Curated annotation (Swiss-Prot):
This is Meiosis-specific coiled-coil domain-containing protein MEIOC. It comes from Homo sapiens. Residues 617-627 have a biased composition (Basic and acidic residues). It is found in: Cytoplasm; Nucleus. Its main location: cytoplasm. The keyword Nucleus applies. The gene is MEIOC. InterPro entries: MEIOC. Keywords: Cytoplasm, Meiosis, Nucleus. Residues 1-23, 609-629, 933-952 are annotated as: Disordered. GO terms for cellular component: cytoplasm; nucleus. Interacts with YTHDC2; binds transcript that regulate the mitotic cell cycle inhibiting progression into metaphase, thereby allowing meiotic prophase to proceed normally. Interacts with RBM46. It holds the Pfam family MEIOC. Residues 936-952 have a biased composition (Polar residues). GO terms for biological process: chromosome organization involved in meiotic cell cycle; double-strand break repair; female meiosis I; germline cell cycle switching, mitotic to meiotic cell cycle; male meiosis I; metaphase chromosome alignment; mRNA stabilization; oocyte development.
Length: 952
């Protein structure tokens, strides 16, 4: 083997090591010019020098080292030539390892002495561990991971941390959303074949069966060809049947029937409708075609009708946003699908209002929007609702409109009988006298898709009551508030009804987002209890978290007798409900709906709506109760505010939320005692009565994440008194339930990113601390009698009087890195050989990343002080915060690599004869003990750092 001169380190004769029996068996000079320090006893002085022979091949992976007292180890001298206040982004090229093939051509026949040295190296490897098996891992410590790996030790990120940066931005192929359309995988496009029509899907399936080796470009062409025949403005969910029964046939009261539609899962999604044209042809109405598969009635007002329909759809779609739940997984974004502008409605004959006034004739032949259906005076119009809509639900004061004003705005009345964009069945209303026939037909109807029976029962229950005159504005059901009712019986029953409705709606959602709960203060139908009972039996988990105060038989029985039956012969149906004698504790009847954003919907008796006992709406009665509405609404908001304040932690970071509790409640029967909160006691002492404890405890609606909260601008225009409560100050988020207290302080984009990076790096630091302790325990177990400790006297900067989380993290990282360096020095002494060069390089880069974070933190403080000195309000610059977050991210990566290097060093140091079971058991006990201590510390103070509690 060729011997090179002039590129070696001095070779001292370690007399001190000979005395202690720790003389190295062989010297490992390497190709690096800088030496890595090895600790020895304080009293030993090294005078000899290792040989200047450089070994090629496997020996070229090792650096030369100089022994030094371990008590005087200085990080600044050990890892970087710069001072502690300076750093360099460049890395010495000598730190990198030479590959195996570098000197492959220069190898010559080695001498006998060199052969003996090589044999001793191999013997030492066999005696002292699995070093040969770790070469692949150790040499790749400094390389980036091929796949995006989370920096959290447990592998999962907290649910309230959402980063705007991908885990590994160097590999965009792993992030399909960052690629262009042409570079994305083909599989993500093939799954969209469910959007084709019958003919397209079948043809494509046959083609792929014949030839499964299509190229990606051919697949793209096939998909593009299929999409060219689509009209993107059309409805994406058409009925699967083309007969008359799948159309919305609005008929007279005597022949009203409930019809339900079946919607396909994959196919038949673009089959054109034929029921509308058939019905219109049979009715004798002149029609004409426009667009693609669209029809309209001929007449003078045909263009006007089309315009009205489009305006109505725009109004209707305003309340169909923020939807992230769909029954069919094929439709990733169901809220993008527009409603069917050609909904199948038959022409309604001229009707008369309850007071004898003819209905406005301008919308008689409107085939796009069916405005309302008139009932006799003793019945109520049942408005069709969509239970899966998720709207912002805060009551808006209903203006008092006369019949003339209503006739002008009638075209904008929301008809919720339109085809739902979720693939659910429409909700069809029917009068009480035909309900028995409808129920009988439903039981013998054609089987529907899964859970269809449940949706039938929901259809019959989730219909809100309005006046028989048809007075209804274009507002969702959460805007319908009630008027004062002079009869106490319906309000005693309303608690049961609202509770049941909230359960049904929450169960139908299947997620944390609850839907709109229509107020059923007065109905004229009886639900099909068999269907509801059957669903409860088949899906017991949906109702497992709810608690009723009476048995299941009485539950179904009470549901069957909903209040508001106006026929004299049906008054006896109230007995089973009124016998329950469910009354409010303080005279109020405030039903709380578990809304998506946790906002309270007050429907107490002081609110106003069409009177449920009389079929006539008196527009002059509303102002009589307006004062009571405002006063009692704000009182309930005050009381609910105290409940939400109890879910804020009392120490550390004020933005951390306790997610094990809830802040919303479905209604007043599921509310807990709010007086346990100190803030609520302060609010209650201002003259507002406190509610007593309710028997059902807290609600099951979980607390939403902070990024799901509604903005101030979205709320201010929905409620007229909101600006009076909160003033003109804007803010970026709302608490789940709000009152007069100002909302919480939220983070901006850079601050949020900094918070996420801090959490990641702190997690890596804790993991490094655990692994270092496990390493010490393993070494002490396998080398009894040896001094294996990471204790050192390396100077570490002290914290300031008011340190931030970044300052604490910097000090903790420096302290832990010094301990790891000391422990690695002990490992080299135990194994009598140097460790791999990548291990020392990983430690060098870790220290360098810490110095960079120190510099970024210093720049942030200096820039903030300069802005304050110039008279600018003290605020953080986004650039400084982003730079600090980027530096912390790099330090997190370096910490993870140090963990890998420590583990590799331990595996190379442990003797081969060590029993794995003897090592694993004490390590596991140590980890479990440390986890318990860490959990107890976090439970007392979430933001308390482990570095402050440990005794160093």
């Amino acid at each position: 083997m060729e011997v090179r001169r002039g590129d070696t380190c001095p070779r001292p004769h370690p007399s001190g090591l000979r005395e202690e029996g720790l003389e190295p068996k062989v010297a490992f000079p390497g190709g690096a010019n800088r030496c890595w320090n090895l600790g020895a006893d304080a009293g030993s002085r090294l005078t000899d020098v290792f040989g200047s022979v450089m070994l090629t091949g496997s020996a070229s992976f090792y650096d030369c080292y100089t022994s030094q007292s371990e008590d005087n180890v200085d990080l600044r001298q050990t890892y970087t030539p710069f001072s502690s206040t300076e750093y360099s982004s460049s890395v010495d090229s000598s730190l990198f390892c030479a590959p195996w093939s570098t000197y492959g051509d220069d190898i010559k026949q080695p001498s006998n002495s060199q052969i003996s040295i090589k044999n001793r190296i191999q013997t030492e490897r066999n005696d002292y561990g699995s070093e040969t098996d770790l070469y692949g891992l150790v040499s790749n410590i400094l390389e980036e991971q091929d796949k995006s790996q989370p920096y959290f030790a447990e592998g999962t990120c907290s649910s309230n941390l959402k980063s705007v940066w991908p885990m590994n931005t160097s590999r965009f192929a792993d992030h399909h959303d960052l690629l262009t359309e042409t570079k994305r995988p083909i599989d993500t496009v093939i799954s969209q074949q469910a959007f084709y029509s019958d003919e397209s899907v079948s043809a494509m399936e046959k083609q792929y069966l014949r030839n499964s080796n299509l190229t990606p470009q051919q697949k793209i062409d096939e998909l593009h060809h299929g999409f060219t025949g689509l009209d993107l403005e059309e409805q994406w969910m058409y009925p699967s049947r083309s007969d008359h029964s799948n159309c919305h046939n609005i008929q007279t009261n005597d022949t009203a029937k409930t019809t339900f539609q079946e919607y396909p899962l994959i196919k038949n999604c673009f089959t054109p409708q034929t029921g509308l044209s058939d019905i219109m042809k049979e009715s004798g109405v002149d029609i004409y075609h426009y667009g693609r598969d669209r029809i309209c009635t001929k007449g003078l007002e045909a263009p006007l009708q089309q315009k009205r329909a489009e305006m109505f759809l725009s109004q209707f779609n305003r309340y169909n946003e923020n939807v992230d739940y769909c029954r069919y997984p094929e439709y990733v974004h169901p809220n993008k699908a527009k409603l069917n502008k050609c909904s199948n409605f038959s022409v309604q004959d001229s009707k008369k209002l309850a007071n004898g006034t003819p209905e406005t004739p301008t919308v008689e032949a409107d085939t796009y929007t069916k405005l309302f259906q008139v009932k006799p005076a003793n019945q109520k119009k049942m408005e069709e609702t969509i239970p899966d809509q998720q709207n912002f639900t805060f009551p808006k004061t209903t203006p008092h409109l006369t019949e003339k004003q209503f006739a002008k705005e009638a075209v904008f009345t929301a008809d919720f009988g339109l085809t739902s964009e979720y693939g659910l069945k429409p909700h069809t209303a029917c009068p009480a006298n035909d309900f028995a026939n409808v129920t009988e037909k439903q039981q013998f109807a054609k089987p529907d898709p899964p859970h269809s029976e449940y949706f039938k029962s929901v259809n019959l229950l989730s219909n809100s009551a309005t006046s028989s005159g048809g007075i209804n504005l274009n507002r969702p059901t959460w805007m319908n508030v009630q008027t004062k009712n002079n009869t106490p019986i319906p309000y005693r029953n309303q608690g049961n009804l609202m509770k049941l409705n909230s359960h049904l709606s929450a169960a139908s959602k299947g997620s944390n987002h609850s839907s709109d709960f229509p107020q059923l203060s007065s109905t004229n139908l009886t639900p099909n209890s068999n269907l509801f009972q059957k669903y409860c039996q088949e899906n017991p988990s949906a109702f497992s978290s709810f608690d009723f105060s009476y048995s299941g038989a009485e539950r179904i029985q009470s549901v069957n007798h909903i209040e508001g039956l106006t026929k004299p012969g049906e008054e006896n149906l109230f007995k089973l409900v009124t016998d329950k004698k469910i009354k409010q504790p303080n005279g109020f009847c405030d039903n709380y709906s578990a809304q998506k954003y946790g906002i309270i919907e007050n429907v107490n008796k002081h609110n106003f709506q069409a009177k449920p006992q009389s079929g006539h709406y008196d527009p002059e009665e509303g102002p009589k109760h307006l004062d009571g509405l405002s006063q009692n609404t704000y009182q309930d908001l005050l009381e609910s505010q105290g409940h939400s304040n109890s879910h804020r932690t009392r120490g550390g970071d004020n933005s951390r939320v306790n997610r094990t509790q809830v802040s919303c409640f479905s209604n007043n029967y599921m509310m807990g005692d709010l007086r346990h909160n100190q803030c609520f006691q302060q609010l209650g002492s201002n003259g507002f009565p406190l509610r007593s404890t309710h028997p059902f405890g807290h609600s099951v609606v979980p607390l939403l994440d902070s990024y799901d909260l509604l903005s101030y601008d979205d709320l201010s225009h929905l409620y007229p008194y909101f600006n009076m409560m909160y003033g003109d100050n804007s803010f970026s988020g709302l608490m789940p339930t709000f009152g007069f207290q100002r909302p919480i302080k939220t983070r901006s984009g850079p601050a949020s990113e900094l918070h996420i990076r801090l959490e990641e790096c702190c997690e890596q630091w804790r993991a490094l601390e655990k692994e270092r302790k496990k390493t010490e325990l393993a070494l002490a177990k396998n080398y009894p009698g040896k001094k294996v400790s990471s204790t050192n006297n390396t100077p570490v900067p002290r914290l300031t009087s008011n340190p931030s989380r970044v300052d604490r993290l910097i000090v903790d990282e420096l302290r832990e890195l010094a301990r790891v360096v000391t422990l690695l020095g002990k490992m080299e002494r135990l194994r009598s050989s140097l460790l791999h060069a990548s291990i020392s390089t990983a430690l060098d880069r870790h220290l360098e990343s810490i110095h960079i974070v120190q510099s970024r933190r210093k720049d942030e403080i200096v820039n903030a002080s300069n802005r304050q000195r110039q008279g600018v309000p003290r605020c953080q610059d986004d650039r400084d915060v982003f730079a600090l977050a980027s530096a912390i991210k790099e330090m997190c990566v370096a910490t993870r690599k140090t963990r890998t290097a420590l583990w590799c060093a331990l595996q190379m140091t442990l003797p081969k004869t060590a029993s794995t079971a003897d090592v694993v058991k004490p390590l596991q006990d140590t980890v479990n003990c440390e986890d318990k201590v860490h959990e107890s510390i976090n439970s007392s103070n979430p933001m308390n750092q482990r570095g402050e509690t440990n005794k160093h």
